[in-house]
């Protein structure tokens, strides 16, 4: 397997950083990250770093992908929404873990590229949409888990409304200083847990690109 040594080394790094869920680790190990980045960065594919993917966006560092995926507490039957398809890498990881993934991307060029990559990997349990991530995907909800791959300045209420009872929202919140949060729905109440400081590109609402 190409990059086999690099993939193994990355798994060791993720475990050292506290990623413990074997299913999540196996999902990350099974996705060829080099397919989701520009060829110029392919030599960095299995380094624990974020990398540019164009349009002012990035592919998250593998640790953050692992951490956010763990926090979703997924089962195979989990109904999952991803806000911010980006390169499609996080989408591909989720697709290893659940029966179906719904993913929204506001930048058409990124959505198209992600669809092409996911098809190349024969991942057919994914539905993508060009749309405003702040609004979620109302007619496909409610969702057991929602993951947001860009930072919101404030909590998107429409996403909270699309959670099932007991559903989890994992989202970075803040402007310059951002905190990764896990929000769990309990009836009409929402329990918020601060996880750690992070740095993401901003979650842009409104007009599509």
Swiss-Prot record:
Record field: transmembrane: none
GO cellular component, one term: cytoplasm
Any Pfam family hit: PCMT
Active site: 60
Keywords: Cytoplasm, Methyltransferase, S-adenosyl-L-methionine, Transferase
Protein EC: 2.1.1.77
Source domain of life: Bacteria
Subcellular localization: Cytoplasm
Molecular function terms from GO: protein-L-isoaspartate (D-aspartate) O-methyltransferase activity
GO biological process, one term: protein repair
Known catalytic reactions: [protein]-L-isoaspartate + S-adenosyl-L-methionine = [protein]-L-isoaspartate alpha-methyl ester + S-adenosyl-L-homocysteine
Listed InterPro entries: PCMT, SAM-dependent_MTases_sf
NCBIfam families attached to this UniProt entry: pimt, PRK00312.1
HAMAP family xrefs: PIMT
PANTHER family tied to this protein: PROTEIN-L-ISOASPARTATE O-METHYLTRANSFERASE, PROTEIN-L-ISOASPARTATE(D-ASPARTATE) O-METHYLTRANSFERASE
Family named by the database record: Belongs to the methyltransferase superfamily. L-isoaspartyl/D-aspartyl protein methyltransferase family.
Job of this protein: Catalyzes the methyl esterification of L-isoaspartyl residues in peptides and proteins that result from spontaneous decomposition of normal L-aspartyl and L-asparaginyl residues. It plays a role in the repair and/or degradation of damaged proteins.
Identification of the protein by name: Protein-L-isoaspartate O-methyltransferase
Native organism: Photobacterium profundum (strain SS9)
Top-level taxonomy: Bacteria, Pseudomonadati, Pseudomonadota, Gammaproteobacteria, Vibrionales
């Amino acid at each position: 397997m190409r990059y086999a040594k690099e993939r193994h080394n990355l798994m060791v790094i993720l475990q050292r950083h506290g990623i413990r869920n074997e299913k999540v680790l196996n999902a990350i190990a099974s996705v060829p990250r080099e397919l989701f980045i520009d060829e110029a960065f392919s030599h960095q594919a299995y380094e624990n770093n974020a990398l540019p993917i164009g349009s002012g966006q990035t592919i998250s560092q593998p640790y953050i992908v692992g951490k956010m995926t763990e926090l979703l507490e997924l089962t195979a039957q989990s109904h999952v929404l991803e806000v911010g398809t980006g390169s499609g890498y996080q989408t591909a990881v989720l697709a290893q873990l659940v029966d179906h993934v719904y993913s929204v991307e506001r930048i058409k060029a990124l959505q198209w590229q992600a669809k092409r990559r996911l098809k190349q990997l024969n991942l057919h349990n994914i539905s993508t949409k060009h749309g405003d991530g702040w609004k979620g995907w109302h007619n496909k909800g409610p969702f057991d888990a929602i993951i947001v791959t860009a930072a919101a300045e404030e909590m998107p209420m429409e996403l909270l409304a699309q959670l099932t009872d007991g559903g989890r929202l994992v989202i970075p919140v803040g402007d310059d200083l951002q905190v990764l949060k896990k929000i769990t729905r309990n009836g009409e109440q929402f329990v918020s847990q601060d996880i750690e400081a992070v740095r993401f590109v901003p979650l842009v609402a409104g007009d599509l690109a």
